[in-house]
Design a protein with these regions (language model features):
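Cytosolic regulatory and coupling regions of membrane transport/channel systems
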Residues: 1-43, 151, 155-160, 170-342, ...
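Pore- and pathway-forming membrane helices of multi-pass small-molecule/ion transporters and channels
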Residues: 10-20, 35-46, 50, 54-76, ...
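Short, amphipathic, aromatic/basic-enriched membrane-interface segments that mark the entry/exit
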Residues: 22-34, 52-53, 75-85, 103-106, ...
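Hydrophobic alpha-helical segments that drive targeting, anchoring, or assembly
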Residues: 69-88, 93-100, 104-109, 233-246, ...
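Alpha-helix capping and helix-loop boundary segments enriched in small/acidic/polar residues
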Residues: 107, 111, 184, 322, ...
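Conserved mid-sequence domains
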Residues: 298-401
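Composition- and surface-driven signal marking solvent-exposed, interaction-prone regions
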Residues: 348-350, 365-368, 439, 469-473, ...
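Hydrophobic alpha-helix feature that most strongly marks membrane-spanning transmembrane helices
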Residues: 359, 375, 379, 383, ...
Length: 557
């Protein structure tokens, strides 16, 4: 492809893949945290309500308790604020849903509100970078509450108070590990970066490019974690400083400095096992590098409302995704109604679950959702006689399914859906029992309708801004490369060199991520492949020229 074809209007349709859709991957390194937190946060208020004879109210407490699956990678200093905002956001959606349910019997209006809430949840969670499961849990709870039978306006404050109580339990559960391991999230984030650097140091030439990208992304994520971590005591401050030194050392591997993979992996193991933080060999000017990188990243990363508004500015790639979610969720709900489903919340949730960064990922997620839901409905049918034997059995089943969901979701979405489907159906049963056969049939119909509507919306609402995002990322990469080259001719100040390396590595990650997203759009103009390849090559060369220990002669070469 010539450079002239970059701006050509021609488009081509990319095939949607089937290979590897159902492949089982590795478990997440901290899967057990959410897998234990979720059932505990649900079980405590549910068992209290069971003892009081009001298990029917557990649907409302579960709205807050489900927030316990979030924020397990956040440092505790920021986790407290993050969880409070997430719980309030959950309750805001529940409040809108309950008021709507109490104010109108029109299923069409309820579906429209559910679709708008789904779009808002998806957009805000992506903008805030909450991480998995993003806005989907908020959408599930709000959509379920929209179809709660016999809701009255007078009961809404009490039901929201129950949700707040469940949220308080979730907050305590997610903060409790900080009493034992207060720097656990920071250690885990840096360990991931060191493990990635170890793989890069031992990578074969044909796998070095992907390993370099993965390492740079892990380092980037670890820096974000450290910048949100508190250091209120001298001991915590000293530990954080050592963690920062390890990150700087991992960054030199990305820049091309050879290292021992075994040593890097050993340092990562020490961090995970709560041993003293390793101390890499000191280098001249390292303190200046640390100060430069920390100051540069702190200035470049807007937080709170300012960061949220920046992510949602006009031209944001999140806006087409929001339009897709609103359109697909509404189509799914209304189609389900037309097919005779009385409470089509599951179709709305399914459509919302399908939407990913591009249509290729959405296609994969749709197939995984369909397969997982079908198997999950079979499991629900098997469990039904047990769960209807009594309230205690119902609560125990939900807790067990929550554990299995969080233990398997990271391995493959379809596998997690096998457990999340019966869990979600049983949680709705807390409010009122429904005929089992009809419930299973409607949920399977809703699944098919939701997947179809979601994929149709992806095809109709195109994300043409994906290619524009590549152009913006390339412009940042070109600027970072030029700045790095300007420092490469002599003996730059270590702090300046470290800042330039860090900016350049982050810019390379952004370009590759933008290309991956745009490449997954099936109806897309020609991508600037030659320009991307040239910019990445120049960026990697400039990054290598700034590797610590290289003199002017080696840089010039």
């Amino acid at each position: 492809m010539s450079e002239k074809s970059i701006g050509a209007p021609a488009v081509r349709i990319r095939p949607l893949p089937l290979r590897g859709v159902l492949k089982i991957g590795k478990a997440a390194d901290i899967w057990h945290k959410a897998a234990l937190s979720a059932p505990i946060a649900f079980g405590v208020p549910a068992l209290v309500l069971l003892a009081l004879g009001r298990l029917d109210l557990a649907l409302y407490t579960s709205a807050g308790s489900l927030c316990a699956i979030y924020a397990h990678g956040e440092p505790y200093a920021s986790r407290a604020r993050f969880m409070a905002v997430m719980i309030l956001g959950m309750l805001a959606g529940v409040g809108i849903a309950l008021v709507t349910a109490a104010s109108t019997d029109s299923a069409a209006i309820r579906v429209a509100v559910a679709a708008l809430l789904a779009a808002a949840h998806k957009t805000l969670c992506d903008a805030a970078r909450t991480g998995p499961p993003g806005g989907l849990i908020l959408t599930f709870v709000a959509a379920s509450c929209l179809f709660v039978p016999h809701e009255r306006l007078a009961d809404v404050p009490f039901h929201l108070a129950l949700g707040l109580a469940g949220g308080a339990v979730a907050w305590l559960v997610t903060m409790a590990p900080g009493l034992v391991r207060p720097d656990g999230p920071e250690r885990t984030a840096v360990a991931r970066a060191l493990e990635a650097a170890s793989r890069l140091a031992g990578a074969e030439p044909d796998g070095a490019a992907r390993a370099r990208h993965d390492t740079a992304a892990a380092i980037n994520a670890a820096w974000h974690t450290l910048l949100r971590a508190g250091a209120r005591t001298p001991a915590r401050a000293a530990n954080r400083r050592r963690l920062e030194r390890l990150l700087v050392h991992a960054g030199t591997v990305v820049a091309g400095t050879p290292d021992d993979p075994g040593r890097l992996a050993g340092w990562a193991a020490d961090l995970r096992r709560d041993r003293p933080v390793p101390r890499p060999p000191a280098r001249p000017g390292e303190d200046g590098e640390l100060a430069g990188i920390a100051a540069d990243r702190a200035a470049a990363a807007p937080r709170g409302v300012r960061g949220l508004l920046r992510a949602l500015r006009p031209g944001s790639p999140l806006l087409p995704v929001a339009a897709r979610v609103a359109t697909g969720a509404a189509l799914a709900g209304w189609a389900s109604m037309a097919l005779g489903v009385g409470r089509p919340y599951w179709a709305v949730v399914t459509a919302a679950a399908v939407f990913q960064a591009n249509i290729t990922l959405s296609w994969r997620r749709g197939l995984q959702r369909a397969v997982g839901n079908l198997a999950g409905l079979a499991l629900f049918t098997v469990l039904l006689p047990t769960t209807r034997a009594g309230g205690l059995a119902l609560v125990a089943a939900v807790m067990a399914l929550q554990f299995c969901t969080e233990a398997t979701m990271a391995r493959n979405y379809w596998l997690g859906s096998v457990f999340v489907t019966p869990m979600a159906l049983l949680m709705v049963e807390l409010a009122a029992l429904q005929p089992a056969g009809r419930l299973a049939a409607e949920r399977w119909l809703d699944t098919c309708v939701g997947v179809a509507a979601g994929l149709l919306s992806c095809a109709l609402v195109t994300n043409r801004r994906a290619t524009g995002r590549i152009g913006a990322a390339l412009a940042r990469l070109d600027a970072a490369t030029a700045a790095a080259r300007a420092l490469g001719g002599g003996a730059p100040d270590p702090a300046e060199a470290a800042r330039a390396r860090d900016r350049l590595a982050s810019a390379l990650v952004d370009v590759r991520d933008a290309v991956d997203v745009a490449s997954g759009e099936w109806w897309q103009g020609a991508l600037p492949a030659e320009r991307v390849e040239r910019a990445e090559r120049d960026g990697h060369r400039a990054l290598a020229a700034l590797a610590p220990g290289r003199g002017p002669a080696s840089r010039a070469a």
